[in-house]
Amino acid sequence: MKRQKRDRFERAHTQGFKAGLHGRSKDNCPYQTQDDFRSHWLGGWRDAMEARNTGLFR
């Protein structure tokens, strides 16, 4: 059985989360011209910032 491709929106969210954990700026979003993907990336970034502020990650 073939492995399904990942959902591109989920991948954008995950990449945004990783960027947020590493303390990168939201201006470094690789999806500047693609609003749908940018929205998911920023959602992941915001989730990471919230997790950092609550002390879940350093």
Curated annotation (Swiss-Prot):
Q: What does this protein do?
A: During stationary phase, converts 70S ribosomes to an inactive dimeric form (100S ribosomes).
- Name of the protein this chain belongs to: Ribosome modulation factor
Q: Which GO terms describe its cellular component?
A: cytoplasm
Gene3D superfamilies linked to this entry: ribosome modulation factor like domain
Q: Which organism is it from?
A: Idiomarina loihiensis (strain ATCC BAA-735 / DSM 15497 / L2-TR)
The record, for HAMAP family, names:
RMF
Top-level taxon of origin: Bacteria
Name where it's found: Cytoplasm
Q: Point out the gene that encodes the protein.
A: rmf
Major subcellular site: cytoplasm
- Does the record's keyword annotation contain Cytoplasm? yes
Q: Matching InterPro entries, A to Z?
A: Ribosome_modulation_factor, RMF_sf
